[in-house]
Amino acid sequence: MCKKICIFMAVLGLVLSTDLSARKAKVSIETPASDSRIEYTGRILVNGDDVSYDWSGVYFRIKFSGPYLAMKCSDTKNCWFNLWTDKEMSPKADKVFMVGAADTLVVLAEGLGKGEHEVILQKRTEGEQGRFTVHSFITEGDILQAQGRKERHIEFIGDSYTCGYGTESHDKNDPFMAETENCNLTYAAIASRYFGADFNLISHSGQGICRNYDDFRPGYNMPDRYSLTFDESPEHIWTPDMAPYRPDVVVIYLCTNDFSTARQPHETIFAGRYIELLKKVKAYYGDDMPILCLASNVTPFSFDYIRNACMMSGLSNLTYVALTSGIHNYEDDLGASWHPNYRGHIKVASSVIPYISTITGWEMEEKPYR
């Protein structure tokens, strides 16, 4: 009798083991990164199953059923990311991690409850830190259609301030470190969250309108990079039909580096290149696209340069604003290398938000800037 029971239990165990293995194999689903149900925001290049990008702040939303989500990916250097599960983007991510190798498997979520879930993954570092490629996603349930884009969208064009250089540092004497660069804590992200808007960033540290920081790489400035799909490569030219969105307003925050290291650019050259950038934006999105032009607090001359360039352009729907030196303090509001930290960026955002409200007609609500 005992022998029969043992044989029965052994057979039952084998059946259960085989059944569980079959179920496990059945529910492991691999989906290409280019699947249309996954929603990317920012400049990307789709190549077969792969999706690649390097600009700051590019993010995707992926909705799925089941407890598990993993990503097969590659990185050319060391990109850092913010991740949120089952919530909107906020100042504090659920998870922060770095990818620094090719053909890497990253578990984005596991142990989730039954039902539908959504993960948002945002690239928090800029193009100099690497190009990122998503190959595919692994789930134990179905990939579902992402929730859809927000009704509002803002595009920001800028330099290290827009990239989030040093935002997580609390000492202005700290050097640059990739792990303290976080575009999600910039004025751009704060303003976008305030209005409940999607956003994309076209930004690169050290870039100017006609002169980069300390004259680095003369003759190649932000008006040139703006035409590119990848920040760090001129190989692919970007066109607006490559994106499934059109911004409601474009914000340009450039000129700090033009006046860097106690130098002043020739105003005629500056105006010519600024107008070139304005015309590129208008060519992409139409003459009716409103553009908010922010003058840096680096020098009082920056506002005169930008205002004069806008007036010379002959273009409509341009607003120019000066951010003066008193917009934040130079102790607690600064992070690495004298760049605004999160606290400083909140103050910048609080000055920019009213102008965006006026330009777009979006009402300002009684809620904190965060």
Residue ranges and their predicted role:
Residues 156, 199-201, 320-322:
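Conserved beta-strand scaffold positions in the cores of enzyme catalytic domains, especially
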Residues 8-15:
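Bacterial N-terminal signal peptides
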Residues 41, 202-204, 294, 323-324:
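Conserved beta-strand termini and adjacent loop/short-helix elements that scaffold enzyme active sites
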Residues 57, 124-129, 167, 173-268, ...:
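Conserved SGNH/GDSL esterase-like catalytic core that processes O-acyl groups on lipids
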Residues 224-369:
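Alpha-helical cap/lid subdomain in secreted, periplasmic
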Residues 2, 20-157, 161-180, 361-370:
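N-terminal secretory targeting modules
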